[in-house]
């Protein structure tokens, strides 16, 4: 058994979670054994905290968490740890709304940590994003937003996504980073330039004094690339995109096949 503690970073969707958005009993049991052995387990996700807290609680974690792909990092159980919030300037957000309107997009959402602003009313999106328990404001973002935001989501027509992303790269490359969500959502997610999961993971590893060679990170999508590269052992899911598998040190089974648990059991001889 390993005696020095490892830091194990888990993406949620397509990685830790099965397709039905649950954690298998096998995976829960494996994570508990690693925690009992003194290892640190953390979540590193593109989701906001409000839609990842249930998994944090289910796994009974006691570590900081990375949300919004690194734009928000905090410790849910220790306010003194600090809150690292890297936001998008409000003037840039207003420009993003302008360009979105010119493409007649379905909607634009702005998130300020756990408050959500919709440019247009959209019951379907509110339900899909599980926002019924969230502070939701509907109306022109240029009027309703009074502070810098954590992230912007542009829900566009599929055929317009490449053109909008090209514009973002041409005009705002120094200020923002943008990614396209996996199907079926034709959503462009925008955060402050330079933010990624590795930035958040480094804050956590520094806090615990765990060197990179004792960090294991799991992921499946392009927002996991930097984190897998940062970790001493980056593990791609079997269902991951090719770019993730190419950059990873190892590839495990799919999220439906308990890929996380299978790798960890083998690695730590559980």
From Swiss-Prot:
Which pathway is it part of?
A: Cofactor biosynthesis; riboflavin biosynthesis; 5-amino-6-(D-ribitylamino)uracil from GTP: step 4/4
Q: Which residues are listed for Mg(2+) binding in this entry?
A: 11, 13, 220
Q: Which GO terms describe its biological process?
A: riboflavin biosynthetic process
Query: Any idea which positions bind phosphate?
Result: 12, 45-46, 197, 223
Q: Which UniProt keywords apply?
A: Hydrolase, Magnesium, Metal-binding, Riboflavin biosynthesis
Where does the record place the catalytic residues? 11 (nucleophile)
Q: Name one GO cellular component term.
A: cytosol
GO MF term set: 5-amino-6-(5-phosphoribitylamino)uracil phosphatase activity; magnesium ion binding; phosphatase activity
Enzyme Commission number, as recorded = 3.1.3.104
Per the entry, which co-factors are needed? Mg(2+)
Q: Which reaction does it catalyse?
A: 5-amino-6-(5-phospho-D-ribitylamino)uracil + H2O = 5-amino-6-(D-ribitylamino)uracil + phosphate
Q: Which family does this protein fall into? A: Belongs to the HAD-like hydrolase superfamily. Cof family.
Q: What does this protein do?
A: Catalyzes the dephosphorylation of the riboflavin precursor 5-amino-6-(5-phospho-D-ribitylamino)uracil and of flavin mononucleotide (FMN) in vitro.
Which NCBIfam families does the entry mention?
Cof-subfamily, HAD-SF-IIB
Q: Name it.
A: 5-amino-6-(5-phospho-D-ribitylamino)uracil phosphatase YitU
- Native source species: Bacillus subtilis (strain 168)
Write the gene name: yitU
């Amino acid at each position: 058994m390993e005696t020095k503690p490892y830091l194990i970073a888990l993406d949620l969707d397509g990685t830790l979670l099965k397709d039905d958005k649950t954690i298998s009993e096998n995976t829960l049991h494996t994570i508990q054994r690693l925690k009992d052995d003194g290892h640190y387990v953390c979540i590193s996700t593109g989701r906001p905290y409000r839609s990842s807290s249930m998994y944090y609680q289910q796994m009974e974690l006691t570590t900081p968490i990375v949300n919004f792909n690194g734009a928000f990092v905090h410790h849910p159980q220790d306010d003194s740890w600090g809150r690292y919030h890297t936001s998008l300037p409000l003037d840039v957000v207003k420009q993003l709304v302008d360009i979105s309107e010119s493409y007649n997009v379905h909607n634009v959402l702005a998130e300020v940590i756990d408050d959500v602003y919709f440019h247009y009313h959209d019951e379907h999106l509110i339900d899909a994003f599980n926002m019924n328990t969230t502070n939701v404001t509907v109306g022109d973002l240029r009027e309703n937003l009074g502070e810098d935001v954590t992230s912007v989501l542009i829900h566009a027509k599929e055929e317009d996504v490449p053109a909008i992303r090209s514009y973002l790269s041409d005009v705002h490359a120094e200020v923002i980073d943008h990614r396209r969500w996996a199907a079926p959502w034709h959503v462009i997610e925008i955060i402050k330039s330079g933010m990624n999961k590795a930035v958040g993971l480094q804050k956590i590893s520094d806090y615990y004094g765990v060197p990179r060679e004792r960090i294991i990170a799991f992921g499946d999508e392009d927002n996991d690339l930097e984190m897998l590269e940062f970790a001493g052992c980056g593990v791609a899911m079997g269902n991951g995109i090719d770019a993730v598998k190419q950059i990873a040190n190892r590839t495990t089974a799919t999220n439906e096949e308990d890929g996380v648990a299978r790798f960890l059991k083998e690695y730590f001889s559980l």
